[in-house]
Each structure stands twice: as C-alpha cells, then as structure tokens.
Amino acid sequence: YQLQTIDIYRTLSLQSAPSSNSLIVWPETAAPFYFQQHNAMQSAVVDIAINSRSALLFGSPSYERHREYISYMNSAFLLKPDGTLSGRYDKVHLVPYGEYVPLRSLFPFIGKLVAGVGDFKSGKGYYPLTIDEHHLGVLICYEGILPDAAREYKRRNAELLVNITN
C-alpha cells in the first residue's frame, strides 16, 4: 500500500503543479514510511519534487537512534524543487493516547494496557522551515488550533503557516 499511496500523490501533484517554484502540500501521513531511510519510496517522493519543479511539504514518521533506544516522531519534511531536503519539523504538541501515553513513566503497566498506541517523542520547538528565502511555520494536525504555536512561529519570522492533517 505504501507505493500505491505515493503513486496517488504523484498523479495528483504532477497534474496540479501550477509552475516551477511553487509549494505542494500533502497531508500528515502522506508518506506512510520512514522517509529518512534511503530506499525506493524515498526516491519516488524525491522524484515528485524534481518532476513538479516545486517544493514539497509532507508528513512522514521519523526516528532518532540513541545508544540504548530509538525515539520516534510525527514529522513533516520539506523538499526543495531539486529534491534535496530543506528541513524537518517534529510535532511538538502530541495527542494523548494517540501519539503518546501520559504518565507512562509513573505507571509502567499502562504501556501494556494500550499496546499499539503511538509513543512519539515531542519535537524541540516551533522553528520555521525555509524554502528559498521564505519561512514556513508548519503545524501538524491539531497544533493548528494552538495560538501559542502560531505566535512562536511569527516571533521566529514565519511568513506562512501551513497545517498538515489527515
């Protein structure tokens, strides 16, 4: 289903790409794989940015390897029109019981009760992503209703707020 999903977005993106140097925005879970891994799916997404001659903003899970564990994040990636990575935003304000389990450290047994629930790590802050000389404030899902997030992006010179959601 992963390649089929990318094929759908490829068709939609290439038929609607208005001109070079535009921005194409996909939803929160548009890339249902770890985009940061070098494989055929990553190449397919990069090719869409190149062939559309547009910047591409999309959601994909991501991870960071640490010595003794791996952290997972709900992320947005921004590709330049040449397919290179401009930046990544990791969602800061996570949804309880959907993206993390509250009080897990105090009550370890909760993890067994809610097996299968996401256990994402929160991002480090609201830092704009840059494409050319433009600064985008990216919000994922219900972060779009948080006025503090929008204010923080504005304080950091974001010119456009983009909310990706499913």
Regions found by a protein language model. Give the residues of each.
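Enzyme catalytic cores with a strong preference for nitrogen-chemistry domains
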Residues: 1-166
